[in-house]
Amino acid sequence: MPSKDLRADADLIIKAALASVDPSRAVKDALKLDGDRLIVGGQTLDLGIYKRIIVVGAGKAGAPMAQAVEQVLDGRIGAGRVVVKDGHGAPTDVIEIMEASHPVPDDRGVEAGRSIANLVREEAAQDTLFLCLLSGGGSALLVAPAEGLSLADKQQTTRLLLASGADIAEINAIRKHLSQLKGGNLARLAAPGRLVSLIISDVVGDRLDVIASGPTVADHSTWTDCRDILVRYGIWEQVPAPVRQRMEQGLEGLIPDTPKPGDSALDGVTNLIVSSNRMAVDRAMGQAEKLGYTPMLLSTTIEGETKDVARMHAAMAREVLASGNPLAAPCCLLSGGETTVTLGEDFGMGGRNMEFALAAALDLEGLPGVLAVSLGTDGTDGPTDAAGAWADGDSVARGAEQGLKARRFLERHDAYNFFKPLDDLIITGPTRTNVMDLRLMLVTGAEE
């Protein structure tokens, strides 16, 4: 049976979920060394045919992933360079860990990206095995503007696209064509070497071409698509001249397009997702069941406005208590994915997970035996030190006792400053991974 302390149960569920997507553990589970054989996700590679093993990568989880690869390969790595977010470094023996800015790229990211591109280019050979470590944040950290372009050129182009109303798929198509590494270009540099990518997914649906902008995956967009996007949004003449010149050269066939499905540059590439939101949610469900709750997965692909998603979850919790549908209490409703918060001109401090908890608190007001929890698996929710927050039927009343009006804080997107005085923030510290968000509703209907 569930304990009377819903927070204690939720804490155990959260810890189990985060442990299941630990970057080091994920790599070690996917990568096994048996003598001269390297087993990767069911495939066996004969290390005897490779003279050099080179490790490259980018993302928040890059350092623990690199440490794990070094431990598994035990002195066999020839060289390596991995770029991580500031403060996310860790000691390694052979692989060089470089830090750069995230989410806004900086010159250190450019230097790191070009350094990685140069290493891959220099080591590319039939008898080289490349291991590429990709995780959340990789797109902003793996910055290697194509020849003739500067970081400022790419930034200005992205700003114009965002202001014009272009969607993320259109923006990514442009980004890939302005990079030395994105959109399969890293794989092209590594050919004819063997390339294995170990990937921690931070995107809804685990789309390989989207994670870190798909440096080791075929790209379906073309130079023509890019030109059409810029023309359609009326910014062809506004983008920096070097960007327009590169597009024109691509259209004239003077610059190769990004690798497409079937391109020989991708023949020696294996892409393996070693950790994902679904894995975290599955482990959370298992832990909830051990604690006496009937788990139910709503979806791992939930997107949309945060407060609307919260109200849907709260409505399901109320339905469980009112009718026993879609399942009876005690139960645990779980979901994953990544929602969005639309900010107005007047906003405070918070993040999508804290906003979820606050919106849920308003819809659960006065309801006993329900706990709502939402957290970012990277340990960060918005520009704060919190990963998320928890809320229950008493949260609104407890806030009111301290002069905090929950609805006003929600309107101002100021959930951090609502939950902090209540001691209801979830503080995990940086987890050095990112598989999006985890949300759960524990429903018992019993007074704690």
Feature locations, PLM:
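N-terminal amphipathic/basic leader segments beginning at the initiator methionine
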Residues: 1-48, 64, 71, 225, ...
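Active-site cofactor/substrate anionic-group-binding motifs, chiefly glycine-
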Residues: 47-49, 58-88
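Glycine-rich oxoanion-binding loops at beta->alpha junctions
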Residues: 83-126, 174-175
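Conserved phosphate- and dinucleotide-binding cores of soluble alpha/beta proteins
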Residues: 126, 130, 140-212, 220-227, ...
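Gly/Ser/Thr-rich active-site loops/lids in small-molecule metabolic enzymes
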Residues: 149-167, 219-234, 346-372
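Accessory alpha-helical/coil subdomains and C-terminal extensions
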Residues: 175, 193-196, 218-312
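Active-site segments that bind and position negatively charged phosphate/pyrophosphate groups
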Residues: 278, 282, 286, 292-374
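Internal helix-turn-beta structural module
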Residues: 357-448
